[in-house]
């Protein structure tokens, strides 16, 4: 059910809801019905959401007494080609979240920029640039070919987070949600290179276990970022850049990881990738081998829960 309430006195003659599911071929238009409520004109209508779990984007289109039209989205009143739609999430209401979720304060940490527990660490890979000046401006401008490598690191690590546990508890934090900590070759680490190991700049797997154990003493749970819809191209699974030897999915048609990805010449880079970013090849999420790797006994989720994680936020 949607309701649009124009400013009092606005010369609106018609109001429509425009909605578009992520898997829909075109926009759906719903004309909203005007009504007087407390001396104010409001427009109401019903939009039937898709049956499947997906995202739906929507905004409003207004017709004016002078014959013109405008759109209204989260960026306000604007032209059609400038509107920023709102997002509606269609979810499965039988899906259950952990009982503890939502019952306390969750604090999000971007590990590289939070706290450096071990100062002046050597870079574990030669293509990483260390920012010794913690007040320096991050690299944000594109390189000579228009790309962003996200290769500058400020050195935040797991020991730094552990050092701040008393401070976080004092603030009333109950859960720490960490942006990705797995080995990856960018400072944001959403391009996973190795799901089973902490990025060496952040520390070791043992450091993570210690962090979780110490956090529990303060009544704090550690929630990890589970980035399972895609990997990095620079990973031990895809290995386009060759950092991990001569094999793996991109280089070897017989690789056990090959079926995880969708290789096809119709894609710009020869494989399906997240929003067309060549460094983020998408995985076939229902591939049995991949599902077993992520969710099976001894797999990714099982491994990190055993190491002490309280749960996962799924990307």
Task: Report each predicted region and the residues it spans.
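Glycan-association/targeting regions that enable binding to alpha-glucans and other polysaccharides
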Residues: 1-108, 116
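Short, charged/polar micro-motifs that form catalytic or ligand-binding hotspots
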Residues: 46-51, 96, 151, 158, ...
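Substrate-binding/active-site clefts of carbohydrate-active enzymes
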Residues: 110-174, 181-307
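Glycine/serine-rich loop-strand microenvironments at binding/catalytic pocket rims
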Residues: 45, 55, 59-61, 298-312
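Short catalytic-loop micro-motif centered on adjacent basic/acidic residues
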Residues: 223, 311-315
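Residue-level recognition of beta-strand->loop/alpha-helix junctions
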Residues: 177-180, 315
């Amino acid at each position: 059910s949607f309701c649009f309430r124009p400013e009092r006195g606005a010369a609106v003659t018609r109001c429509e809801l425009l909605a578009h599911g992520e898997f829909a071929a075109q926009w759906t238009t719903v004309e909203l019905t005007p009504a007087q409520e407390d001396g104010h004109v409001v427009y109401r209508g019903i939009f039937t959401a898709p049956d499947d779990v997906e995202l739906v984007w929507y905004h409003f289109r207004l017709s004016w007494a002078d014959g013109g039209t405008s759109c209204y989205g989260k960026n306000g009143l604007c032209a059609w080609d400038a509107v920023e739609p709102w997002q509606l999430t269609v979810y499965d209401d039988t899906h259950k979240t952990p009982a503890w979720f939502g019952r306390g304060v969750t604090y999000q940490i971007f590990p590289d920029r939070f706290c450096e527990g071990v100062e002046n660490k050597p870079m574990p890979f030669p293509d990483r640039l260390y920012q010794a000046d913690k007040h320096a401006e991050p690299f944000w401008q594109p390189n000579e070919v228009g790309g962003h490598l996200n290769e500058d690191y400020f050195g935040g690590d797991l020991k730094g987070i552990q050092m701040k546990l008393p401070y976080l508890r004092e603030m009333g934090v109950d859960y720490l949600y960490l942006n990705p900590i797995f080995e990856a070759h960018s400072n944001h680490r959403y391009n996973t290179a190795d799901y089973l190991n902490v990025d060496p700049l952040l520390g070791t797997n043992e450091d993570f276990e210690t962090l979780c154990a110490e956090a529990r003493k303060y009544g704090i749970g550690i929630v990890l970022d589970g980035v399972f819809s895609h990997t990095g191209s620079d990973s031990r699974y895809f290995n386009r850049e060759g950092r991990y030897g001569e094999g793996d999915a991109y280089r070897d048609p017989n690789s056990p990881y090959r079926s995880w990805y969708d290789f096809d010449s119709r894609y710009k880079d020869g494989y399906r990738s997240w929003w067309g970013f060549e460094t983020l090849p998408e995985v076939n999420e229902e591939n049995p081998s991949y599902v077993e790797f992520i969710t099976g006994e001894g797999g990714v989720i099982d491994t990190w829960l055993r190491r002490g994680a309280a749960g996962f936020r799924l990307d």
